[in-house]
Amino acid sequence: MNTATTTDNNAVRKHDVRKELFVDGYEVVIGIEIHCQLNTESKIFSSAPTDFGHEPNSQASIVDLGLPGVLPVLNAGVVDRALKFGIGVNAELGLFNTFDRKNYFYPDLPKGYQITQMANPIVGEGYIDVVVNEGEKNEYPKRMGITRAHLEEDAGKSVHDAVDGMTGVDLNRAGTPLIEIVSEPDMRSAHEALAYIKAIHQLVTWLGISDAIMAEGSFRCDCNVSIRKPGAELGTRTELKNLNSFRFIERAINREIERQIDILEDGGKVVQATMLYDPERDETRVMRTKEDANDYRYFPDPDLLPVRIEQHTVDSIRAAMPELPVARRARFEEALGLSEYDARILTGSRQIADYFENVVAEVGQADAKMAANWVMGDLLGALNKDDKEITDSPISAKQLAGMLSRIKDDTLSGKLAKKVFSALYEREGGDADDAADKIIEEKGLKQETDTGAIKAIVEDVIAKNAAMVEEYRGGKEKAFNGLVGQVMKASRGSANPQQVNQILKELLG
């Protein structure tokens, strides 16, 4: 077996696999298997909880442990979530689906088999549209095929060096519901693979069927990678296992492409194997030779009846489906006049999109761009700085809309609005919808719009800054900005900037 690895430091040949779809004369072929935990409160075949982070082996029931005499009972919520996903990827739905046993031995698989769907999956062929290199000059759309998606139970987890250098087994995860999403081998680069994975990740969180927290293992990716000369038969594939970071996914695929090219260019043969990516050494290496499906001896599970889904159930789920990201993004551009960039940011998650639309519902569609600027720039910026999600925002959509309304009616200038926003973020106005009004009143942040009052301040500034006035009259435009700054300083930022500019120009001639 050739177990050669390739890193940036020790590669004999360097291959630029970042952008090209053909690398050193080879075509890259990638297929993805995604294991996504479904967010039910109990497991797929037992009543045990699915909470993350508890003491090892504290959330495994007798069903999960495979003790004699127990029988699995299918969780109906798992079926509903799988149907949502199938509808979301435009797939054929398996209204008749069955469960099978996948037989293999591993310490974290207590029954000696995994319950899965081999013969009749709940989701058949579908597709998802993605944008590769999104936001970059070389972005392009592509439709990625989905072969199938099936339900199965998760295995436990081996915990290495848990006790005195030994490996322990934590079965809390055993029996957690999974939907395994199998793509067509449609990806031709790491960029395309990453775009597909991100699109699936966004979809499952958008639909509310999974939290998809990669760091907790609830969204894991296996990448099947092969290379071939254009027009040749598919090459031998290797499987990069359990990748749980967007950054590592792209790097791992590129390193595996390099490794396979090196093997073939040296006259060797790629061996079908399961690969590990080592991020510290930035290399892939063989974990074990890859099993074929026959090695698992699949057969129907005798303890679980076939699942028959009525069409009215599908119709009910379809009717309750939310507007999907692509459609919502298009509507933001067409109906609200937002740029492609703004629409993409504001549909980054369903929660962000909902928040934004709630603000627009209060201020009106005509001011959607102003709402977008405040949500994207100020609010998301503050939340990102504090490592918070939009659901943790200390400013409600109605509170932000209330502040924007005061900008619209000239109660607030842009500068004063920043102060009000900061106070809202610190919850100084409380939980009431009119918190912005309370802050404006308590802090005296109302914009001065009385022409007479502003004119008096301007006249005083002109009198005290004769040199700057002469510079302006001598043709130095920067001096005018200096005078505006002096007026704003004298008014403590409360004077209406437009009125200040107008009055200054009138008095200076």
Swiss-Prot record:
Keywords: ATP-binding, Ligase, Nucleotide-binding, Protein biosynthesis. GO terms for biological process: glutaminyl-tRNAGln biosynthesis via transamidation; translation. It catalyses: L-glutamyl-tRNA(Gln) + L-glutamine + ATP + H2O = L-glutaminyl-tRNA(Gln) + L-glutamate + ADP + phosphate + H(+); L-aspartyl-tRNA(Asn) + L-glutamine + ATP + H2O = L-asparaginyl-tRNA(Asn) + L-glutamate + ADP + phosphate + 2 H(+). SUPFAM superfamilies: GatB/YqeY motif, Glutamine synthetase/guanido kinase. It comes from the Bacteria. Its EC number is 6.3.5.-. Allows the formation of correctly charged Asn-tRNA(Asn) or Gln-tRNA(Gln) through the transamidation of misacylated Asp-tRNA(Asn) or Glu-tRNA(Gln) in organisms which lack either or both of asparaginyl-tRNA or glutaminyl-tRNA synthetases. The reaction takes place in the presence of glutamine and ATP through an activated phospho-Asp-tRNA(Asn) or phospho-Glu-tRNA(Gln). Belongs to the GatB/GatE family. GatB subfamily. This is Aspartyl/glutamyl-tRNA(Asn/Gln) amidotransferase subunit B. It comes from Psychrobacter cryohalolentis (strain ATCC BAA-1226 / DSM 17306 / VKM B-2378 / K5).
